[in-house]
Amino acid sequence: MEVTVLEVAPRDGLQNERAIVATADKIRLIERSVEAGLRRIEAVSFVNPQRVPQMADAEAVMAGVPRVPGVSYAGLVFNDRGLDRALATDVDEINVVVVATDTFSRRNQNCTTAEGVQRWSALARRAAASGVRRTVTIAAAFGCPFEGEVSAAAVLDLVRRVAAAEPDEIALADTIGVGTPDRVRTLVAGTAALVPGVPVRCHFHNTRNTGYANAVAALEAGAGILDASTGGVGGCPFAPAATGNIATEDLLYLLHRMDIGTGVRAEAVSATGTWLGEVLGSPVPALLGRAGGFPPARPGSQ
């Protein structure tokens, strides 16, 4: 079995950091990720820099990323202005977020969920015309920090609505880390049944220590792409206590011990997590860098 791990540390991982990370360090994070074998990377966010100052240098980051055959760079886009910026940097993919509840959608994107669907549809048409891969992410799919529970029926209805714009991929995001494996199975299997042939991707946070169990449940239910953040850094600046992306290195250890292939070197990602902690000035939440792999690597082994 093979699974794609999509690295989100350069975007979702860093966006919640208060101290601005230098552009050169962002580019180095991406370079190290590519060197470790990661081939899909969400590198930047083309949003209003006043709302997310950490992403103000998106164009500079994209100008410095290594252009390696087989490596695909994604940018988060909310509106036409963001898409204009993204297309000008030659991104390979765009990710457009549609939030599952009106309250969170207004706080996150200043629009209702219905308006978010309309925005996504318009952006998808433009991106398709430009030959750019299109992902739509349903945020707060497993629960909302303001409205509480979000029913599976409501999420699957939203899947049906966003699917009308023919995404290349549909992502289900546990934005505040409240999901559990049973709910994950229901939504992943339900999404796959509604849009057969469209890959299902999942984005989990480990806020309440369920992220890795949810990742396994997603794979069992048919998801083929998992987001993860080197070091386990990140969160949403517009959702209270939305901390703790699942850590790329810890997820890789789990997958590799289950004989699930990724094409990524966990030890290299773990070393990057340690380096990233030094850049940020505090140890990262990931555990592999502290405990090490198993069986322990022999000197000189790869």
Where are these regions (language model features)?
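Catalytic cores and adjacent flexible loops of soluble metabolic enzymes
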Residues: 1-302
